[in-house]
Design a protein with these regions (language model features):
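Flexible loop/turn segments at secondary-structure boundaries
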Residues: 93-98, 131-137
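Hydrophobic or amphipathic alpha-helical targeting/insertion segments
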Residues: 118-136, 148-150
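Structured, charged N-terminal subsegments at the starts of enzyme catalytic cores
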Residues: 80-97
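Extended, charge-enriched "interface" segments that sit outside catalytic cores
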Residues: 1-78
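A conserved hydrophobic secondary-structure block that centers on an alpha-helix together
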Residues: 96, 100-123, 127
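Beta-strand-turn-beta hairpins that frame and shape the catalytic cleft
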Residues: 188-194
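Conserved small/polar residues in nucleotide/adenosyl-binding loops
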Residues: 195-201
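Extended, Lys/Arg-enriched charged tracts that mediate electrostatic binding to polyanionic substrates
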Residues: 143-186
Length: 202
């Protein structure tokens, strides 16, 4: 009965849909803030007791089902076939705070482009990078010096999915560089259709 929550957590539709965001917030207000408004982490860390309470709450279950129905209706809209498909490339995408693949205004602009493409049913596939460390968090030392703290992103806790090849194994791209080959994993972010790659293996 709670499976719709998992599907909703893996699609960034909730980012710009107030019903979706409010649904996750209402599951556990304190935990939602603690996990940085990350629905994947929320579902991973929410207590079994709270889930039992949700299942027993008729109003909450109606809200889950209504939000999921709204999401499925949105996803059922066909892509336009009267315009060319679009390939969009950017170094960063500002989609949500929990997916640290942007650092400024241009990334937010790129994120808005693909959100609008999704709303407008434009057949767009976006390609970018999945940064392991994202942007840094700032802190101050005892003597007032700024310290840059780089915390690695745990890809298993993000609203992303590994792209699999025909053999069912994670897809890996080989990118030739001078004197070496970079091996990149391919990940999918469900918003319109955004593919990112990380080069953790070499």
């Amino acid at each position: 009965e709670l499976k719709p929550l998992e599907e909703l957590s893996k699609n960034l539709w909730w980012v710009w849909n107030s019903d979706g965001k409010n649904l996750f917030r209402e599951l556990d207000h304190d935990l939602w803030r603690k996990v940085g408004e990350n629905p994947v982490m929320l579902l991973q860390q929410i207590s079994s007791k709270r889930l039992e309470e949700v299942l027993a709450d008729e109003r909450m279950m109606e809200k889950i089902n209504a939000t999921y129905a709204e999401f499925k209706e949105y996803m059922s809209k066909p892509m336009r076939n009267d315009i060319p498909s679009v390939a969009y490339f950017s170094m960063e995408y500002g989609l949500c705070n929990c997916l640290k693949i942007y650092s400024g205004g241009l990334g937010v602009l790129a994120g808005d482009y693909i959100k609008q493409a999704s709303d407008s049913c434009v057949p767009m596939t976006a390609v970018g990078f999945l940064y392991r460390y994202g942007y840094f968090a700032q802190s101050l030392s005892m003597d007032g010096q700024q310290i840059a703290n780089y915390e690695p992103q745990n890809f298993d806790q993000l609203p992303i999915e590994a792209v699999l090849g025909e053999d069912g194994q994670p897809m890996i791209l080989e990118v030739p560089f001078p004197g070496r080959i970079i091996y990149c994993h391919v990940w999918r972010v469900n918003v319109c259709l955004l593919y990112t790659s990380d080069a953790a293996d070499e």
